[in-house]
Amino acid sequence: MIDMLLKKLIKSLPKKKNIRVQGLSINSKKIKKGYIFFAIKGKNFDGEKYIDEAVKKGAIAIVCSKKCQYKHELIPIIKTNNPRYFLSKVCSKFFRFKPKNIIAVTGTNGKTSVADLFYQILSLNNKPVASIGTLGIKYKKNNLKTNLTSPDTINLHQALENIKKNKIENVIIEASSHGLHQRRIDHLNIKAGIFTNFSQDHLDYHKSMQSYLKAKLHLFKNILLKNKAVISDKSLKEFITLKKISKQKRLRLIEINKIEKKLKKNNKIKSLNKFQLKNLSMAILAAKICNVNEKNIFRILHKIKGVSGRLELVRVFPNNIKVFVDFAHTPDALLKTIIALKAQNKNKISIVFGCGGDRDKKKRPLMAKIVKEHCEKIYVTDDNPRNEKPGKIRQEILSNLKKDNSHNIENRANAIRTAIKNASPNEVILIAGKGHETEQ
């Protein structure tokens, strides 16, 4: 068990408070004797309502907002303007050991692909590597599933320390907009930040595109330190902003153009679709920053595998009906995926898709418009409805489609079976939205 003097973690405490810290938690139910409880206000829960429970379970200090009214004669109450920021600062001291080369990748789409490709490149070059993101926390033979793209602050720092203890110095983290906004990635010594792209998503949380972009740019504006690297695509509209930030903060801006051109001339990459070349370019540049030689990278490219659930060909039937699976759950990703399929398949494309509940509702008509324009048969089904009524979500999509080629099928498995049953020889079926996920 890691323990540390409280005054070493939190300098603002009176010097007489020589209390041993055994752990940190944002969940009152997980508090044990000797833990600090961070009473954080979230979307669904207010941590300040659970301070009493944390104290009864043995919390030795409470961190909360300046507005918090809680008082205790024996336990220090540390009030701060931003408890989330304060948590990441304390975590960086409590979990002291971190890998030398930490790469963070953000953007609307492509984070998981970049992370997976980076992991493959380093593994194939016999460099110990880890990845943290949508596919879980992966290193050596460990693959721990997580519910979040970016784990909560404590779990993230703890995971990084475990990775370091396993003698791994290279790690890539998927930095989601939620994770960045909630300061989960603050106070990490990140060697390079990758910006993949930017399009509409998560407006249920961020409320506007400006706020959403601001969250993404937090990585470059506030987390990356002087002389660290920024990797991005020159053709993006946001590249100009990244250039300004890089100049102001004296960051090294690296664009993918040269590497991407080399990849287009390379005939050895068989398992990746053309639209993955940008993601591969970013992964290669990140690998180079981790001291992997470019020649050695290009030597192993023929061994690179497609990313699980990213335009993955999962089945070919005897009559040449092809079934692809993709994680596309934003208008931009869906359009790019369909266009990529059209480029390599001259045949009709049918789609099975839905939209997630309790998420950006403005995406639904936009995604309907895309499939209406590009797909022959459309099977609208459920996709993680969460707390919304599934039928209502499907109806919002269907109201933007033609009746003669769209089908409303509640059960996802039935929708897939129906699409395959109704398919003509040589037809392409795209199952979009869930990618690698196996549960609803």
Predicted regions and their residues:
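Walker A (P-loop) phosphate-binding motif
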Residues: 91-136, 142
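Short internal beta-strands
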Residues: 60-66, 194, 229-234, 352-354, ...
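Residue-level signal for inorganic ion chemistry
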Residues: 35, 54, 90, 105, ...
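P-loop NTPase switch/communication element
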Residues: 133-155, 159
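ATP-dependent carboxylate-amine ligase
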Residues: 1-18, 30-36, 42, 49, ...
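Acidic, Mg2+-coordinating active-site environments of NTP-dependent enzymes
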Residues: 6-7, 64-73, 164-175, 179-182, ...
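Non-catalytic positions within long, well-ordered alpha-helices that form the structural scaffold/packing
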Residues: 51-56, 164, 186, 342
